[in-house]
């Protein structure tokens, strides 16, 4: 299929969203420990920036319940979900209310205080270094303080569906 080229001077956000649906991304649960409890949300906007120092980028909608806690705590954990964790992804994407999300799954506490998912494909415990507001989202650049990985394949999201490498 040929690529559709925009004809208007400004790209329509709907066209952009439709094109982005054709990309694939790992499915992650971003967690943060706050004074009044643990908070978390499902996110696909996560990528590495550099290995020296180990640095990652996440982007979250400013309307997300996690937003204020990330700003206050300035640390978070990226839990890369395993390929068999579709239900967990849905729990943290809003199927369960925030106060019920952590009770359904096994977690351990990192030295930073952040909750880490026992059954993750990989994890990154991070400290915020830079913040930038871009449209509706907060872009966070963070240095990785601790990371781990398992032999389990990650859960992927593309074109509105969960999947994994064949």
Positions of PLM-derived features:
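Basic, polyanion-binding surface patches
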Residues: 1-166
């Amino acid at each position: 299929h040929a690529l559709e080229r925009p004809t208007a001077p400004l790209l329509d956000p709907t066209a952009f969203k439709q094109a982005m649906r054709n990309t694939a991304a790992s499915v992650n649960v971003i967690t943060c420990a706050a004074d009044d409890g643990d908070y978390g949300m499902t996110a696909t906007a996560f990528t590495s920036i550099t290995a020296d120092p180990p640095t990652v980028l996440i982007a979250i909608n400013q309307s997300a319940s996690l937003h204020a806690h990330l700003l206050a705590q300035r640390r978070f954990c990226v839990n890369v979900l395993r390929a068999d964790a579709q239900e967990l992804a849905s729990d943290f994407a809003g199927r369960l209310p925030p106060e019920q999300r952590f009770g359904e799954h096994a977690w351990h506490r990192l030295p930073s205080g952040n909750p880490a998912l026992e059954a993750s494909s990989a994890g990154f415990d991070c400290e915020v270094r830079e913040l930038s507001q871009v449209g509706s989202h907060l872009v966070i650049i963070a240095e990785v303080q601790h990371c781990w990985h398992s032999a389990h394949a990650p859960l992927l999201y593309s074109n509105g569906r969960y999947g994994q490498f064949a």
